[in-house]
């Protein structure tokens, strides 16, 4: 089975077409049905709730029974300094599986790197309902899709 290309999911403001942020998955492992995710939001769109909206839509999409490739697990890494990313992943049930000590240099400082995972069964058992409610509460559901 071939490794699928990196897939980008983008949150776009309907009225202007402006890209508010994105989540990607890459390094799909067909033996373990896992992939690494990463997310990015331009500075002007941070701390406005767009990360939660995009993560909810992304997880609902990739853990849907009909979605291919099938994912058993998603995982991510982030620096210990990145409290916004840590908060976002923990809010959506990602588990901190490990720490790589003194791994990430930023502005002359060394930080630990955290590894987070979310299993399909954890999402389906614990998070699916609240994520769907978050999405349905939006007055204007942003356009979301593969780019």
Give, region by region, the residue ranges found by the protein language model.
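Active-site rim helix/loop that mediates acceptor-substrate recognition in acyltransferases
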Residues: 1-6
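Acyl-donor (CoA/ACP) binding surface of acyl/acetyltransferases
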Residues: 8, 12-147
């Amino acid at each position: 089975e071939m490794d699928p290309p990196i897939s980008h999911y983008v949150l776009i403001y309907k009225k202007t077409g402006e890209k508010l942020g994105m989540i990607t998955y890459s390094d799909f492992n067909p033996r373990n049905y896992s992939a690494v995710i990463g997310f990015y939001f331009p500075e002007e769109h941070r701390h406005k709730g767009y990360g939660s909206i995009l993560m909810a839509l992304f997880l609902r999409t990739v853990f849907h029974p009909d979605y291919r490739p099938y994912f058993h697990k998603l995982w991510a890494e982030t620096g210990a300094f990145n409290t916004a990313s840590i908060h976002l992943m923990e809010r959506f049930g990602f588990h901190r599986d490990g720490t790589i000590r003194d791994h990430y240099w930023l502005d002359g400082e060394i930080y630990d790197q955290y590894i987070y995972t979310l299993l399909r069964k954890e999402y389906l058992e614990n998070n699916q309902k609240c994520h769907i409610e978050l999405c349905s509460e939006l007055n204007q559901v942003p356009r979301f899709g593969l780019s």
